[in-house]
Structures are given as C-alpha cells and as structure tokens.
C-alpha cells in the first residue's frame, strides 16, 4: 500500500468531517445573532417610549405632598374653627384638597357652620373624585357648601351664624383655590410669604368709599368695623368670592398655608416665615409655640393647614 495515498485519504476524510461540523452549528449561531438583535431593538424602543412619555414634562415634577396641621382653641371658650384634608390616596388620580373654615365667634353656632362647610367639601370631593378642571371642582364644592349651610340655617336665620371658607386644591403640579371671608391662603416660596387670596372685610368697602370721596381716608384705618366680614358662609346669597384667573404652577420646595385669622393676626409675617422655613413637619409646632409665647388674653382660635410640595 502506498503510504502517501493513505495520508491523503485520511486528510480528505478529516476535512470533510470538519466542514460537516461547521455546517451543523451555523443555524445555532444565526438564531443567537437574531435574538441579540431583537433584544437590542426592544431596549432601544423602550428607551424611546420613556423619552416620549417624559417629553414636555418639567424635570422637577411634584410627586408628593406632605401635610402639616395646626389647630388650637386659644383663649376662647369654644373651638369654632374646622379644617380637613382629602385622602392622600386620591392624590395621583384626583388631586389633594384642603379646607379651613373659621366659625364667626360673634354669632351663634359658628362651630356648626364651620363643621358643615368642611364636611360638605370633603364628602363632595370624595364623591366627585375630583372630576373636572380645578376651577370646576372648587366652584362645585363651594356651591354645595353654600346650599348645605343655607339649608341648615333656614331663611329666617340667615346672618345669625356664619363661617369663612378657604379651600385649595393641588393636581398635576398646579394649585387653585376659592375663598369666602377673611381666612388666608398664602404661598411660601424662596423665603417670601405671598398672600394669594383677597379678604372680604369692610375695609375693602371703606377704601372704595374713601377714593370716591364719600368718607375721609382716615376712616379706612380707624373705623372699628373695618375687620367685619362683608361676605361669608351663612349670609344666604354670597356677595363675593375669591379665585384665581388661572391655576398657580407649583415648584419643588413650595409650601402653601391656609390659615384662620387667629394665626396671621397673632403673628408677624417674619414669624410665620421662620416657622415654615423649619419644614412642614416642624412648622405647626413652631407656629403654635410662637402664638402661645404672645400670651394674648383674647387669643382667637387658630388653625392652619400646610401643604409642602416635593419631588
């Protein structure tokens, strides 16, 4: 036998086997490559979907609202302030609503009227699930509250009792409000306290009379009736309300405070700012201690709800 022929035969056989082995693994390699391409495609598409979802949204989105609460009787015999905050679980879908009502101490049943206002607002918000624009929701709740208070009093008792109402609603990074009376709604931003709503007291009417020359300008500041309310829950037909033309766009770090006059009449603006600067968890105690330190013998009921906007 020719050894050269045997060698060539073996080499030929090995080469044929190697080629067969390579062909066997080729489909597996192709499948793996296609799967890798599919994975890359899915990752790229997912990234595009996330970018499209976030397109047009601000980088600092308000995702959490923390709430602080202050409620004290002061030197009064009764607590006639009422307040409430909606269920935080409703924030993502419906928004968050807060309300403060200050029963009028000079009239009877102020506590019952303020309680009626708060209960109607919160029950109505829960029932409606906050459907509609901010303005529509707030006006509807105000309408229901006026109706319930008037029904409670009856036509013969209009103006015999009353309460203020200040409510605000946050949804999707925006804030709007409706107020009746002299409870205040303020924004604390960048170390400054900005009053958002207008008070409905006799001072406004006196100022109008003064600029029309009907009374001396000095009477705007000296008339003892100047703090009396000219629009309030319980008067029957409401004369005035306050609401913004457009909702306020909120920023991370903003704080909103809704408070009765027992807070802002007792404290200087700088004292309120100093308390809010401590943060929403510490602010209520800081405000209360500042009020107690004044030791006013006629200290009114004091109530505040603080809403802190966070990412």
Model segments located where?
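PP2C/PPM-type serine/threonine phosphatase catalytic domain
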Residues: 2-311
């Amino acid at each position: 036998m020719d050894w050269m022929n045997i060698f060539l035969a073996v080499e030929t056989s090995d080469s044929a086997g190697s080629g067969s082995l390579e062909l066997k693994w080729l489909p597996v390699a192709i499948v793996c490559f296609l799967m890798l391409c599919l994975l890359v495609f899915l990752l790229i598409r997912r990234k595009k979907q996330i970018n499209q979802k976030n397109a047009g949204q601000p980088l600092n989105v308000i995702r959490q609202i923390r709430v602080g609460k202050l409620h004290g009787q002061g030197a009064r015999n009764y607590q006639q302030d009422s307040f409430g905050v909606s269920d935080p679980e409703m924030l993502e879908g419906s928004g968050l609503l807060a309300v403060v009502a200050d029963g009028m101490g000079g009239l009877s049943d102020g506590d019952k009227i303020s309680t009626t206002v708060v209960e109607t607002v919160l029950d109505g918000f829960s029932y409606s699930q906050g459907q509609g624009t901010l303005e529509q929701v707030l006006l509807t709740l105000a309408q229901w509250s006026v109706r319930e208070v008037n029904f409670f009093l009856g036509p013969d008792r209009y103006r015999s009792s009353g309460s203020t109402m200040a409510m605000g609603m946050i949804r999707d990074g925006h804030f709007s409000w409706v107020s009746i009376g002299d409870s205040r709604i303020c924004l604390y931003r960048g170390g400054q306290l900005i009053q958002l709503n207008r008070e409905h007291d006799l001072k406004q009417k006196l100022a109008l009379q003064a600029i029309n020359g009907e009374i001396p300008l000095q009477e705007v500041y000296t008339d003892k009736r100047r703090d009396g309310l000219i629009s309030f829950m319980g008067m029957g037909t409401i004369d005035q309300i306050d609401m913004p033309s457009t909702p306020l766009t909120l920023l991370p770090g903003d704080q909103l405070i809704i408070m009765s006059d027992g807070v802002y009449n007792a404290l200087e603006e700088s004292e309120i700012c100093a308390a809010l600067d401590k943060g929403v968890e510490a602010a209520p105690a800081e405000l209360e201690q500042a009020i107690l330190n004044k030791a006013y013998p006629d200290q009114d009921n004091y109530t505040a709800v603080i809403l802190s906007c966070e990412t």
